[in-house]
């Protein structure tokens, strides 16, 4: 009888202990959810901001009729959520070039822009932020090669177009390198687009509009090189 009573007491204590454990685990789970929940008034991370900018690229580019890729680039970079620097530009450069290029083509040669812009985004987002510093290759310049590879349907097994795509990227990188650091994603985007405009005219026979560029964002760039920048505002 004593054994049975003792056993039942132990069983009861065990049930109570398990019940307490379940209650505590449930409370901890609720606390964890509350901690991970982002309040509406919190500031979005740079990654979320950049994603918002890129999400609207296709919509803006599909509606744009300009043959001036710098003009298109400016519209894309002027979105409220577009950061001063960052991998967003690895998509914007190629998208601006693609849009202006397509607007220069006759109707019979138009690209499937929805598919092309989706491809620019997919490839551009594979180029990591900081590639200019950590890999020695500016993502904005690489974006010119992405643009070229799409319009020429280039693959790793191509011949002449393989040369063209790599050459375009190399020339853009050369311009970026000659102007030195520290990095400025706006400056490097301008340099890359202007280089691609000349390259496309010479090698593909398509003439996009090439304007004079003046920077309007030097005041918000903490690393601005000032008068050394080729796009510094005129006094």
What are these regions (language model features)?
Residues 1, 36-51, 217-220, 226, ...:
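Cys/His-rich short segments
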Residues 2-13:
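Short, Lys/Arg-enriched N-terminal segments with co-localized hydrophobic residues
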Residues 27-39:
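Bacterial Sec-dependent signal peptides at the C-terminal "C-region" and cleavage site
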Residues 60-75, 110-125, 166:
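Acidic-glycine-rich active-site phosphate/pyrophosphate-binding loop
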Residues 61-97, 182, 215:
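Polybasic, low-complexity association/targeting segments
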Residues 76-87, 126-136, 176-183:
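A short glycine/serine-rich beta->alpha loop
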Residues 93-104, 114-158, 162, 166:
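Conserved mixed alpha/beta catalytic, RNA-binding, or beta-rich assembly cores of soluble enzyme
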Residues 158-201:
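A structural-propensity feature for long, helix-poor, extended segments
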């Amino acid at each position: 009888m004593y054994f049975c009573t003792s056993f039942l007491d132990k069983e009861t204590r065990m049930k109570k202990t398990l019940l307490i454990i379940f209650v505590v685990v449930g409370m901890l789970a609720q606390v964890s959810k509350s901690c991970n929940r982002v309040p509406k008034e919190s500031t979005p991370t740079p990654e979320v901001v950049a994603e918002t900018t890129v999400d609207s690229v296709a919509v803006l580019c599909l509606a744009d009729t300009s043959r001036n890729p710098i003009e298109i680039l400016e519209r894309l970079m002027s979105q409220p959520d577009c950061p001063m620097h960052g991998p967003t530009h690895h998509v914007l450069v190629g998208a601006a070039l693609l849009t202006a290029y397509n607007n220069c083509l006759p109707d019979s040669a138009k690209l499937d822009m929805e598919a092309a812009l989706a491809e620019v985004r997919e490839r551009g987002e594979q180029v990591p932020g900081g590639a200019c510093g950590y890999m020695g290759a500016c993502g904005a310049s690489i974006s010119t090669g992405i643009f070229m590879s799409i319009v020429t349907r280039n693959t790793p097994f191509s011949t002449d177009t393989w040369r063209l795509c790599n050459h375009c990227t190399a020339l853009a990188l050369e311009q970026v390198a000659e102007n030195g650091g520290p990095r400025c994603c706006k400056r490097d985007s301008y340099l890359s687009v202007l280089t691609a405009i000349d390259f496309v005219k010479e090698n593909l026979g398509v003439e996009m509009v090439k304007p004079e560029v003046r920077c309007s964002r030097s005041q918000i760039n903490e690393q601005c090189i000032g008068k050394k920048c080729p796009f510094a505002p005129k006094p």
